[in-house]
Amino acid sequence: MQIKDKVFIVTGGASGLGEGTARMLAAEGGKVVIADMQVEKGETVAKDIGGAFVKCDVSNEADGQAVVAQATSMGKLMGLVNCAGIAPAEKTVGKNGPHKLDVYTKTIMVNLVGSFNMIRLAADAMCKNEPEGTGERGVMISTASVAAYDGQIGQAAYAASKGGIVGMTLPIARDLSRNGIRNMTIAPGIFGTPMLMGMPQEVQDALAAMVPFPSRLGKPEDYAKLVKHIIENDMLNGEVIRLDGAIRMAPK
C-alpha cells in the first residue's frame, strides 16, 4: 500500500509516538485525522500538517464513530494507528492498601478496549473500500509495550492492557483476512515520550544506558519509520514487533 492520498486515523496523535506518526504520514502525502483528548495540542498539530482533529475518548463508541466519519469524509480510509494510552503506576498492594480498582479498570478501558473499539469501527468502514490492486482494503497498527512481556513492579494494570493488545493481534488479523485488512502491533521499549522527557536528566540518562544498542531513548521518528514500513509491506500481518534496542526490563 502507498501512503500518498490515503486517509489515516492516528489516535493519541497530539503528542509523542502519535504525533511523530501523524507528521510522517502527512509528509508522505497522506491525509491524517488526529483523535485525541488534548484539544489544543491536537488542533495545533492538525493545522501544522494540514489534517483534521477530532476530540476523542477512544473507549467511547460515539467518539470513535465521529472520528471514522470524519476520516471517510476526507477520502479512502486505509489506515488506523492506535497510539492513545495511559500508564499509571500502582502496586497490587501498596502502602495505602490494595490497587485501586477504578485505576485498573480505566487503564484497561483506554489502552485495550479503546484500541479494539477503534479497530472494529475503522475496519467496518474499510470493508466498504474498493480493494487496491493487491486486494488490500486497509491496515491497523496498534501500540503495545515491552511491558506486555517484561512488566515491572507497579505495572500490573499497564502490562495487562498491553498484553491484551498483543493477544488480540493474531485473531483480529485472521478475522479481517477475508476482507483484505491487515492487523499489526508494535511493542516499543523506552521512548522519549513527553511523560518520560519530564523526568530529571539523570533518570533519562540511566534509562538510555539500559538499552543494549543503540544505547539511547527511542524517538517518535523511530516508531514512525516502522509504521511506514508496515503500511508499505503487505506481507506483515498478524504479528507483534518489538522496537526496543534489545532491552529486557528488570523487575524495577
Predicted regions and their residues:
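Conserved mid-core segment of classical short-chain dehydrogenase/reductases
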Residues: 76, 86-105, 124, 128-134, ...
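Catalytic Tyr-X3-Lys loop
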Residues: 78, 86, 97-119, 140-141, ...
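A conserved structural motif in NAD(P)-dependent oxidoreductases
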Residues: 211-223
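Residue(s) in the substrate-gating loop at a strand-loop-helix junction
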Residues: 145
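Canonical Rossmann dinucleotide-binding motif of NAD(H)/NADP(H)-dependent dehydrogenases/reductases
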Residues: 3-33
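Short C-terminal tail/terminal secondary-structure segment
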Residues: 150, 228, 232-252
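Alpha-helical segment proximal to the catalytic Tyr-Lys
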Residues: 124, 173-175
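Active-site helix of classical SDR
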Residues: 119, 161, 169
